[in-house]
Amino acid sequence: MKRTILMMLMAACALNGFAADEAPPREEAKLAAAEKQPALMLGDSMMRLMGKAIEKELKADGYEATTFSSIGSGLARLDVFDWFSRIDSTMKAAKPVVVVVTLGANDRQALQDGAGNVLQFGTAEWREEYGKRIGRAMDVILENGAKRIIWLELPDMKEHLHQNYADLVNAIYAEQAAVPSRKDKVFLFSMRRHLSKVPGKYTSFLMSPQGQALQIRDADGIHLSQQGAKIIAKALVDAFWRD
């Protein structure tokens, strides 16, 4: 088991090195913004504050924007909250062209596959099944008319175990976004470069240009504070919507 987890994390770090460096958004990613097309923010508890902050930024620029977030949910326990059904119904109601997603913060746990087998976190089987779920979430969004998905990678985490998990899941995001049917439609966005003095190293505070210490992370070392959410919202909208 330890060897399996180690191999998974090594692969995650290798892949995530590409994703976390975050190349500037390709020009076609910004095309959807040109005609003031509607946007939707979807996610777990990580999206609760971010969604509202992104909405505020977009609405200030004249875009239609809505948010749906579900605290404590994820793709590991679909028996508790069926994200695929929720994505489908929310997409049909909101009819967005651009969708911003964060899912995964709560999924460091065992999951059950379609055959009823319990797959323990840290196994190759877990990684394969979880990757399929990430890919399916992307596909459901695209099948419902979205032209662009902006998938938010997990930020740096305070605890070592959570940081390793974030590295692993970010690598899975990158793998699924690179699938040929998705690669020109799904764009990854690294929160780490905006929330850490050194990407890969957790920090709770950043200094504002005015020299004020800003608390950017929640006390749990996982979620963002309201100030952190505002930082990500501005960076995201600047990158994908603004010239």
Regions found by a protein language model. Name each.
Residues 2-7:
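Sec-dependent signal peptide recognition
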Residues 10-17:
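Hydrophobic h-region of N-terminal signal peptides that target proteins for export
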Residues 20-21:
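Boundary of Sec targeting at the N-terminus
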Residues 26-131:
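Conserved SGNH/GDSL esterase-like catalytic core that processes O-acyl groups on lipids
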Residues 48, 52, 56-59, 85, ...:
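Solvent-exposed, polar/charged alpha-helical surfaces in well-ordered, non-transmembrane soluble domains
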Residues 55, 59, 63, 92-95, ...:
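Sec-exported extracytoplasmic/periplasmic mature domains
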Residues 102-108, 137-170:
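Active-site segments of SGNH/GDSL-like serine hydrolases
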Residues 156-243:
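Catalytic His-Asp segment of secreted/periplasmic serine-dependent ester chemistry enzymes
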